[in-house]
Amino acid sequence: MQIDDKLLARLESLAMIEVPEEKKESIKAELGEIVNFVENLNSLEVEGLEATFTTLEGKTPMREDTPMNDEEIPALILKHAPQSAENYFIVPKIIE
């Protein structure tokens, strides 16, 4: 799949990021490689193959769930948001 300027602009809009002009060509190339890799994975025939690894069997170790309240974390996260108010992200309305 070819990543063109139109698709990159749409991805920028959806992700609410702006790719610098000097990095657009390299980003398009990298995204193209990722899409090609996924297309290769999609073309593999895996019907009838037994899974060789899964975490569904309960082998993942449990950890204690300890509540924490660090008041700096929301500020650190929201400082990267284009818009925020009262510890919430403000995003454009996409569903009518």
From Swiss-Prot:
One of its GO terms (molecular function) is ATP binding. GO terms for biological process: glutaminyl-tRNAGln biosynthesis via transamidation; regulation of translational fidelity; translation. The keyword Nucleus does not apply. It comes from the Bacteria. InterPro entries: Asp/Glu-ADT_sf_sub_c, GatC. It holds the Pfam family GatC. It catalyses: L-glutamyl-tRNA(Gln) + L-glutamine + ATP + H2O = L-glutaminyl-tRNA(Gln) + L-glutamate + ADP + phosphate + H(+); L-aspartyl-tRNA(Asn) + L-glutamine + ATP + H2O = L-asparaginyl-tRNA(Asn) + L-glutamate + ADP + phosphate + 2 H(+). Heterotrimer of A, B and C subunits. Belongs to the GatC family. Allows the formation of correctly charged Asn-tRNA(Asn) or Gln-tRNA(Gln) through the transamidation of misacylated Asp-tRNA(Asn) or Glu-tRNA(Gln) in organisms which lack either or both of asparaginyl-tRNA or glutaminyl-tRNA synthetases. The reaction takes place in the presence of glutamine and ATP through an activated phospho-Asp-tRNA(Asn) or phospho-Glu-tRNA(Gln). This is Aspartyl/glutamyl-tRNA(Asn/Gln) amidotransferase subunit C. It comes from Wolinella succinogenes (strain ATCC 29543 / DSM 1740 / CCUG 13145 / JCM 31913 / LMG 7466 / NCTC 11488 / FDC 602W) (Vibrio succinogenes). The lineage of its organism: Bacteria, Pseudomonadati, Campylobacterota, Epsilonproteobacteria, Campylobacterales. The gene is gatC.
